[in-house]
From Swiss-Prot:
Transmembrane segments: none annotated. It comes from Yersinia enterocolitica serotype O:8 / biotype 1B (strain NCTC 13174 / 8081). Its main location: cytoplasm. The keyword Transferase applies. It is found in: Cytoplasm. It catalyses: [[Fe-S] cluster scaffold protein carrying a second [4Fe-4S](2+) cluster] + N(6)-octanoyl-L-lysyl-[protein] + 2 oxidized [2Fe-2S]-[ferredoxin] + 2 S-adenosyl-L-methionine + 4 H(+) = [[Fe-S] cluster scaffold protein] + N(6)-[(R)-dihydrolipoyl]-L-lysyl-[protein] + 4 Fe(3+) + 2 hydrogen sulfide + 2 5'-deoxyadenosine + 2 L-methionine + 2 reduced [2Fe-2S]-[ferredoxin]. This is Lipoyl synthase. Its EC number is 2.8.1.8. One of its GO terms (cellular component) is cytoplasm. The lineage of its organism: Bacteria, Pseudomonadati, Pseudomonadota, Gammaproteobacteria, Enterobacterales.
Amino acid sequence: MSKPIQMERGVKYRDADKMALIPIKTVVTERQELLRKPEWMKIKLPADSSRIQGIKAAMRKNGLHSVCEEASCPNLSECFNHGTATFMILGAICTRRCPFCDVAHGRPVTPDANEPEKLAQTIKDMGLRYVVITSVDRDDLRDGGAQHFADCISAIRAKNPTIKIETLVPDFRGRMDRALDILTVTPPDVFNHNLENVPRVYRQVRPGANYEWSLKLLERFKEAHPDIPTKSGLMVGLGETNAEIVEVMRDLRRHGVTMLTLGQYLQPSRHHLPVQRYVSPAEFDEMKAEAMAMGFTHAACGPFVRSSYHADLQAKGLEVK
């Protein structure tokens, strides 16, 4: 029997190294096996990248992270060029090892106690009016990182009194009661937690997560804060069917979720789960129509949609696709 790999604290495991640590089998995708990207998935890069470099410099200066960079988001250039970013707190090393995600896995370091103040000042310097705060999973912390979220919310509001804050939280596995007790005292303006995909493929896509647990987290926050929008999203193209997506949408509505995002999964590297299909813009439009008919107050559905993509516009109920 082989000995378990001893991970050094603070070291990032990515791509092949990360996949080797996953308890499910993943197969490297050969070039000839890759699905050809359709025309609607082609991205145009901005001619001027000075704003992009400015945001990256501000992040580096303050030791901050963006999920845009860490997760290799396809919208990075567009969002950074418009002066928006989704900040990722609690470090850049995740205790989970989902095979769809490009965020590094490993043993995280102790959270930076100064991060809330640095984050708040950076947001003020950038002049942001709407901000999304997310994090890696921190199963090593007794509250899953909930207090750090609360500290960040408080610090941001102290320096930016009129700002709107959306949190994209992990599932706080095994720590839901403690986490919700903390977040109830300092709630965000929008509470977001992504289901990511349909329950049939959870073991393959989200090892270590539980579909019902995630639904319960969303439901319990909504019960505690009925006037605060709750939000969730899925990435499609991982083997699910459109009918299964619609059923997940029904589950979300049954658990009080009011905002929805649906976007196309893109394989970060050939070591990650492969794209099994590209969903057409017309199909996304049909799913949006279904969502609105179910009673969602807002549904952003399109190939490049991500949960924080133009999140300020989503919160205002404006169309994003």
